[in-house]
């Protein structure tokens, strides 16, 4: 029998049994353009940064599964699609129409779920008298105090992405699935021993948990440049971190302004008396919990606004005829 006859026979057999010999192609999402024969599928990416696409070997693709040929013969959701006879591309509903609707849903979700903290940002500027300026992807807060001291606070306006190792995560998941009953029993015994140790060393464990929570919190770095009145050569720069809960950390300082190459003093290696007093001095110049909240809210608001504006721009593009 010829190849054409065998293929035709297989098609008739599978169609009569309400099954399909068509295989699934990894990477096609939501069934958009199901007949375009795309050989591109996305790979894992972190945060909102775009990652390069991965080309799929066409020899491994025999077709695209659709809901028209599901094995149970039932169609839960079906939308009539029309295709251009010449290009074989979907024309109704068009991909642009579907994408426009998806963009609008994303815009609505961002505006509904995430709070608008612009009022808190404006309130801080009015109360503490800082002047806000922008230089590229950095924001600057400037103020001259009554004693003539000039303070400049600088921080990045782009939120730093949290790096994720997807390959390592997949490997860990596979290892967990491969664990046998003996290993699970051993883990249970270890957990029982740990519980006993936790009861005996409750205070020490609480301290470790607190330190772990501080390390997991997403902090925003910022710098403070202090210029004494009439002494430009006596500039000092402090390195700090602002947390989402209002806490902040002063990690070090050095003589000089922004960008100067100087070995900083690690405040963590100084005495508690020094650390307490340096915090009190900086509080006199507006370095406090309100500033920490301001930096976090400002970066967070910019991130949400950037997302919304990007979706709106894409929606406007696909909405044009």
Swiss-Prot record:
Region (Disordered): 157-220
Entry superkingdom: Eukaryota
One GO BP: cytosolic ribosome assembly
Residue ranges of coiled coil: 167-212
Residue stretches of biased makeup (Acidic residues): 161-214
Keywords, ordered alphabetically: Coiled coil
GO annotations of cellular component type: mitochondrial matrix
The protein, known as: Putative uncharacterized protein DDB_G0288137
């Amino acid at each position: 029998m010829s190849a054409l006859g065998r293929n035709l026979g297989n098609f008739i057999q599978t169609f009569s049994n309400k099954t399909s010999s068509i295989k699934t192609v990894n990477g096609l999402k939501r069934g958009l353009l199901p007949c375009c024969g795309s050989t591109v599928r996305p790979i894992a990416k972190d945060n909102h940064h775009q990652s390069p696409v991965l080309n799929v070997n066409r020899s491994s693709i025999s077709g695209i599964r659709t809901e028209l040929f599901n094995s149970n013969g039932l169609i839960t959701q079906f939308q009539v699609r029309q295709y251009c006879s010449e290009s074989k591309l979907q024309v109704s509903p068009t991909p642009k129409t579907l994408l426009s609707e998806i963009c609008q849903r994303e815009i609505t979700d961002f505006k509904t779920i995430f709070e608008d903290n612009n009022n808190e940002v404006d309130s801080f500027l009015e109360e503490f008298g800082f002047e806000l300026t922008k230089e590229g992807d950095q924001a600057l807060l400037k103020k001259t105090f009554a004693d003539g001291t000039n303070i400049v606070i600088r921080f990045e306006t782009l939120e730093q992405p949290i790096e994720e190792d997807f390959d390592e995560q997949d490997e860990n998941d596979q290892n967990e699935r491969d664990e046998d009953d003996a290993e699970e029993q051993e883990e249970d015994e270890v957990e029982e021993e740990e519980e006993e140790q936790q009861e005996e060393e409750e205070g020490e464990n609480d301290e470790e948990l607190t330190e772990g929570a501080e390390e997991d919190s997403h902090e925003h770095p910022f710098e403070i440049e202090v210029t004494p009145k009439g002494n430009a050569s006596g500039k000092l720069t402090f390195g700090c971190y602002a947390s989402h809960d209002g806490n902040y950390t002063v990690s070090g300082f050095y003589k000089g302004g922004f960008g100067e190459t100087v070995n900083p003093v690690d405040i963590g290696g100084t005495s508690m008396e020094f650390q307490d007093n340096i915090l009190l001095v900086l509080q006199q110049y507006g370095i406090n919990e309100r500033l920490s909240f301001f930096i976090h809210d400002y970066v967070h608001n910019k991130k949400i606004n950037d997302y919304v504006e990007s979706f709106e721009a894409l929606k406007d593009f696909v909405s044009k005829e």
